[in-house]
From Swiss-Prot:
GO terms for molecular function: flavin-dependent halogenase activity; monooxygenase activity. Radicicol is an important pharmacophore as an inhibitor of heat shock protein 90 (Hsp90), an ATP-dependent chaperone involved in the post-translational maturation and stabilization of over one hundred proteins, and which activity has been implicated in diverse pathologies ranging from oncology to neurodegenerative and infectious diseases. It comes from Metacordyceps chlamydosporia (Nematophagous fungus). Pathway: Secondary metabolite biosynthesis. Chloride binds at S324, G325. FAD binds at G14, A17, E47. Belongs to the flavin-dependent halogenase family. This is Flavin-dependent halogenase rdc2. It comes from the Eukaryota. GO terms for biological process: secondary metabolite biosynthetic process. Keywords: FAD, Flavoprotein, Monooxygenase, Oxidoreductase, Signal. Residues 1-21 form the signal peptide. Its EC number is 1.14.14.-. The gene is rdc2. Flavin-dependent halogenase; part of the gene cluster that mediates the biosynthesis of radicicol, a resorcylic acid lactone (RAL) that irreversibly inhibits the HSP90 molecular chaperone, an important target for cancer chemotherapy. Within the cluster, rdc2 is involved in the chlorination of the resorcylic acid lactone (RAL) structure to convert monocillin I into radicicol. Also chlorinates monocillin II to produce 6-cholomonocillin II and monocilllin IV to produce 13-chloromonocillin IV.
Amino acid sequence: MSVPKSCTILVAGGGPAGSYAAAALAREGNDVVLLEADQHPRYHIGESMLPSLRPLLRFIDLEDKFDAHGFQKKLGAAFKLTSKREGSHGPRGYSWNVVRSESDEILFNHARESGAQAFQGIKINAIEFEPYEEEYPNGEKVANPGKPTSAKWSSKDGSSGDIAFKYLVDATGRIGIMSTKYLKNRHYNEGLKNLAIWGYYKNNIPWAQGTPRENQPFFEGMRDGAGWCWTIPLHNGTVSVGAVMRKDLFFEKKKSLGENATNTQIMAECMKLCPTIGELLAPAELVSDIKQATDYSYSATAYAGPNFRIVGDAGCFIDPFFSSGHHLAVAGALAAAVSINASIKGDCTEYEASRWHAKKVDEGYTLFLLVVMAALKQIRMQENPVLSDVDEDGFDRAFQFLRPEAVKKFTKEDVAQTIDFAVHALNNMAELDMDIPEHMINGDKEGENGVTNGNNGAAKTAGLASNMEKLTNDEEKVLNGLRILGKAAPGGTLADFEGTAIDGLMPRLEHGKLGLNKV
């Protein structure tokens, strides 16, 4: 079968975001073509899934297949950010630790089984646009470069061609063809420029051996505050072990070991700074190379436009501390499917549908960015009680938002509690070691734009975030008013997703009727 000359919806990229979007849209009877530049199975890091994946897979009838595959069940995880404190999430609800080459291929094949025409080894090189004739203003996380109408592709066997389409889903990963080549709107978070090294081990000591939490993921902050380490047990008998640290501190560490220091040596030094993980690995054997990759966090000023949607890493990426990447990819893919189908069905205008998608993606990024910033700051400060009250020696409250109940819908109060916690953390940082300039805390009156911490107000929180992590102007809005209030936390049911109204539109998650309702 060859790539067709035209389709209704072109999905560029066959990773989790693209495959999920293609499956959801094809199941609605749409003519969908999915093009993946690589060949499955292909390696990818990012093995630890959140419980929110299960209801998302359930919606496209894929949960049972994932469950039957034999992936390591993830009943929870522990986060030890300082030398004294340990927090966890679970055990209500579960997810999996996956081998991404296997899980990504399952998703890709499911898109084909759902009715999408799926091709591998096909790369999108360029996109053609034409003017969009209807009113479509820039702003509010959307952009109008024109309407994409066709794409030029090439294959690994040397063939090439063009494919025309009515809608485009950009799921091209960090390449992000729309953001980087056409919109040129990707912005890096200067405070979250990290570098990761990782490898795979066998014969380690399971974490929490002999307890109900045995062999669950474990994350530990380095004692020098440079970053954090992970251990994620996999069903193939290996354990994924890695370290994430600020890029400048990584090279400082490498320099201290000598100019010829290898990543294996650097990993060994990181394990010394994560003593619990170091003990777990004492009898273990490294069975892979130590890999390295930049781990820069970024976002964009727009995630949609006339007849196109941007999903997953093609739009935004955050430090992987809370397994955010895969969740944002799949949740964003569902948002793309909902909004495109709504546009096709005439539930609303294309401008309204695309703006809904863009804001939905931005909200997910916002929630994770807020908590990741607070967690990383705790790691860097170590003994200062940023993520726990002075009289509390645990992080359970901090990670409550990662503990979905099987049938519980998150309320405004639930989300507000999470936000209040993060605001409390940021304000503690100010009390500990920050001198906030007056001009950074001027702005909205307390309480006007949402939840406050009781005395400082949202504008001060925005200033704290800007000072704390050198946020871009766009990212300062993350804490400016805390507009997440009433939006869905990453939870255990699709009610969290479906029950959220944006600009008077709510998602309608019914097979055969996927779209948006006006409320």
